[in-house]
């Protein structure tokens, strides 16, 4: 019986509109929010200004709150995406011309997107999985790019936290794996000054993480850090510079290369691979 009802909802646009209206709280401007599907439920979207939220086919978007204040802000959720907000505020934007893109096949759970500023962009590429992750942007012209097949699995309050400010970029390559309680910070958020002349000493800077990198528990990547491909960042490491050697383990405070000629795999092997 339930399958027949769902089939009818999918086939008849009027019934779909009634279903969406019953189980969600969307603005009355129908062209501002384009979301439909039997798994679009218990969401609240608040738009103040000229903004747009678009959702593709076969998505499951449930228990989220989107608050967007400003003009020309866009949220694009592509096909076959799951976003479960557990009744939390999933997206908050305040500013103009900000853009969030979540590509097809992503699985997003208990993850927040926070933007206060203008001309910022967050791109989550195909088949990315996030849990207890925070994307936090302040001021203008910042970008976050997460490569395909990357996983970020925080636990409860031990989140994976991205903090960007002052027009910086954070790039994460494809097939990376993040543990929990991790900090990625392109700015110190406050100023350290030369005592004599008042010159600022801690300028914000970009962070780049190569492909197939594994970031361990409680590690921290600070402004100006670059992690090469096929790198393991050990638990508790604090990275503060550009590392140049691939296939290494980086560990310590401050972090340095402690082992070379390594690779890693998501699978836990009980015996040697070769």
Regions found by a protein language model. Give the residues of each.
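Short coil-to-beta-strand initiation/turn motif
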Residues: 106, 221, 237-239, 255
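Short beta-to-alpha loop/turn elements within the nucleotide-binding domains of ABC transporters
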Residues: 225, 237, 243
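Flexible, glycine/small-residue-enriched loop-and-beta-strand segment within the central core
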Residues: 65-225
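Conserved catalytic-core motifs of eukaryotic protein kinase domains, centered on the activation segment
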Residues: 188, 243-244, 261
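Membrane-proximal basic amphipathic "stem/tether" segments
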Residues: 1-48, 259, 265, 273-274
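Short-chain dehydrogenase/reductase
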Residues: 232-233, 249-251
């Amino acid at each position: 019986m339930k399958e027949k009802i769902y089939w009818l909802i999918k086939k008849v646009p009027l019934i779909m509109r009634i279903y969406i209206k019953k189980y969600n709280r969307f603005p009355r401007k129908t062209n501002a929010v384009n979301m439909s599907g039997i798994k679009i439920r218990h969401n609240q979207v608040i738009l103040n200004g000229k903004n747009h939220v678009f959702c593709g086919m076969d998505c499951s978007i449930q228990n989220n709150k989107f608050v967007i204040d400003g003009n020309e802000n866009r949220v694009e959720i592509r096909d076959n995406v799951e976003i479960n907000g557990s009744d939390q505020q999933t997206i908050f934007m305040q500013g103009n011309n900000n853009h969030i893109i979540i590509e097809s096949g992503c699985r997003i759970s208990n993850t927040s997107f926070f933007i206060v500023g203008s001309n910022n962009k967050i791109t989550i590429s195909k088949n990315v999985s996030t849990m207890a992750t925070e994307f936090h942007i302040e001021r203008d012209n910042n970008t976050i790019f997460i490569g395909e097949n990357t996983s970020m699995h925080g636990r409860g309050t031990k989140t994976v936290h991205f903090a960007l400010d002052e027009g910086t970029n954070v790039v994460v390559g494809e097939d990376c794996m993040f543990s929990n309680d991790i900090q990625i910070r392109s700015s110190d958020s406050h100023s350290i000054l030369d005592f004599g002349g008042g010159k600022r000493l801690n300028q914000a800077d970009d962070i780049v993480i190569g492909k197939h990198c594994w970031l361990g528990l409680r590690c921290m990547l600070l402004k100006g850090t670059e992690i090469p491909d096929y790198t393991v960042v050990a638990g508790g490491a604090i990275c503060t510079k550009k590392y140049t050697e691939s296939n290494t383990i980086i560990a310590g405070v401050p972090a340095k290369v402690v082992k070379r000629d390594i690779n890693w795999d998501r699978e836990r092997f009980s015996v040697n691979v070769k």
